[in-house]
Amino acid sequence: MSIISVRNLTFCYEGSFDNIFENVNFTIDTDWRLGFIGRNGRGKTTFLRLLMGDYAYEGSITASVHFDYFPFTVTNESLTAAEILLTVSGIAEYDFWRAERELGLLGVDESVLPRPFATLSNGEKTKLLLAALFLKENNFLLIDEPTNHLDLDGRRLVAKYLKSKRGFILVSHDRAFLDECIDHVLSINRSTIEVIHGNYSSWQREKTRRDDYERGENSRLTAEIANLRNAADRIASWSDKVEATKIGGGPCDRGAIGAKAAKMMRHAKAQESRLEREIEKREALMHDVEYDERLKLHPEPYFRQNLLLSKDLSIFYGDRCVANGISFTLNRGDRIALVGRNGCGKSSLLKLLIGQPIAHTGTLEIGSRLTVSYVPQDMSFLSGSADDFAAESEIDITLFKTILRKLDFKRTQFTKDMSEFSMGQKKKVLLARSLCQRANLYIWDEPLNYIDVISRLQIETLILEYKPTMLFVEHDEAFVNDIATKVCRISLNQ
């Protein structure tokens, strides 16, 4: 057993005046399965990069283990999967049985080994690189959002695999995934970083309890401060009046009145000191309370009960049929989750519904004059200012920015080019645009990819409150269970 010690860590990016971390201190055991959580833009990936030695910083990070980062960058994807395994893991060819064992645990068929790495699916690449990195000796793995390219079955397999391992930091926003495979939580809060024993759910329960206590204390202290201020004002006003009566009075009167005024002034000073102490107590509170402000949505009712009908629909990639027999009816008020393995045509079906040219056969009936709000998976097109994006999208810029602020955007973020945003922040931009749009149907393609847990909960609350008609693809098991009124399972056509 060894530890990773972080002492007085301070860091900001070159050219920035805002510290990402300031005098941060904590200790990690290298045997822990540590979940790393926090809102988008708080510095999770930055901290992993600091551990890797990619940036200069103030303070110290000491460790007796070697850090490896996932996702690992493969520079030559023409190499076979087997060659990548050997190169990344550093194991000898006679030990290759160990690699095959790891792949078996991750549900990867050995038939992928002779294939060029470039031909593997994103899910297969994720699993192969995880296996390779865990085969390395005396390393501590920094795993940055491994679930983004995994379907639900893949997430369950990887969670089970990670649960069997020791010694890693895992950045993920998938609650069910975290609960399955971690035993400690490292949380970047609004003003502190904390480490606790337990999984995500135990951290969330403790966080909720503490936030509720601090809100209650804040309300109590606010009322106490108001009472003290009123009392201090009354005493000061009385003292001023008494001082005024001394003018023109006799010597005895002035002496008696002066003594009373002095006593009241001492009392006022005591009240003032107590007031300052109560204010300090209040200021010490609420530093880490997350403000998960309620979002709003404006779904437009459709004039018919039925919005969509799919019957025996088949989706093609070129000449290859990837899915067939897709049948479902979307009625007003339904929230249908499309569920299936990666590559089975879920995203293509959504693109087909918004009018993109997707090869297909079968019956697809779409209601006339149906207005749709669409959140795509792809975010690579986002660049320029948020103001220009809002104008191009024909949405209210004030409402757009208000929603982003509620999703934890800082005001300074709006001065940046969107190409500089984190992946989570880019996804929030697309979600905020959708929330600004009045629509009969909301079609969202993996809306929670890269989105932090607190924002996910805000979005869940929004949907359950406003009950929009939705068709969506999402691999977050907790979200699907909470939100979907129906599930349409799409099978991959082998």
Residue ranges and their predicted role:
Residues M1-N218, P301-Q494:
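ABC ATP-binding cassette signature C-motif
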Residues S2-I4, Y213-C321:
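Flexible nucleotide-interacting loop at or near the entrance of a catalytic core
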